[in-house]
Regions:
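NAD(P)-dependent short-chain dehydrogenase/reductase
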Residues: 1-19
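Glycine/proline-rich active-site loop of Rossmann-fold NAD(P)-dependent oxidoreductases
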Residues: 1-2, 35-46
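Substrate-positioning beta->alpha
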Residues: 15-34, 44
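An acidic site on a long C-lobe helix of protein kinase domains
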Residues: 24-28, 55, 119-120
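Hydrophobic "lid"/C-terminal helical patch
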Residues: 32-36, 63, 124-131
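Terminal hydrophobic/aromatic helix or amphipathic segment near a protein terminus
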Residues: 46, 51-103, 136-137
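Amphipathic terminal alpha-helices
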Residues: 108-110, 118-139
Length: 139
């Protein structure tokens, strides 16, 4: 959520050349409840995430095209992210994602619970609205 806040406020002049799988907290909550109610879930682990990783630049483009004008879609050079990671905790945590792709196998979750993840774009925009709402209450 911190990265979203930085992107939305314009405090992130460039986005990392990295991609991650995202999880919508509403999906996580839903699967937790369904797992408690479904005996087929006993003793199993369920992955709740997007099937494919999404690039941070894609997140930035979604935000930018939906009125979040302070968001930058420029890519940060990897060497810069590595350097900044020596001083910034969030940049440091992003280093492990550079140049790697992680795919989440959600087939068991989808099959067991007849579940489809909330669309990525909706998750991004709803997250932004939630952060905006919170920040307006704090101010």
């Amino acid at each position: 959520m911190g990265m979203f806040k930085q992107m939305m406020s314009g405090k992130m002049p460039m986005v990392p050349q990295a991609a991650i799988n995202m999880s919508d907290v509403r999906d996580i909550a839903k699967i937790h409840v369904l797992a408690l109610e479904n005996e087929k879930a006993n003793g199993k682990r369920f992955i709740v995430t997007t099937e494919e990783p999404f690039a941070f630049q894609e997140v930035a483009k979604i935000l930018k095209s939906n009125g979040y004008d302070k968001v930058s879609t420029r890519l940060a050079p990897n060497f810069l992210l590595n350097f900044i990671g020596n001083f910034d905790r969030e940049a440091k945590s992003m280093r492990s994602f550079i140049g790697k792709t992680y795919n989440g196998d959600v087939s068991l979750t989808m099959k067991t619970f007849d579940w489809n993840p909330i669309p990525f774009k909706k998750t991004v925009l709803d997250t932004a609205k939630s952060i905006e709402s919170y920040l307006n209450k704090v101010d």
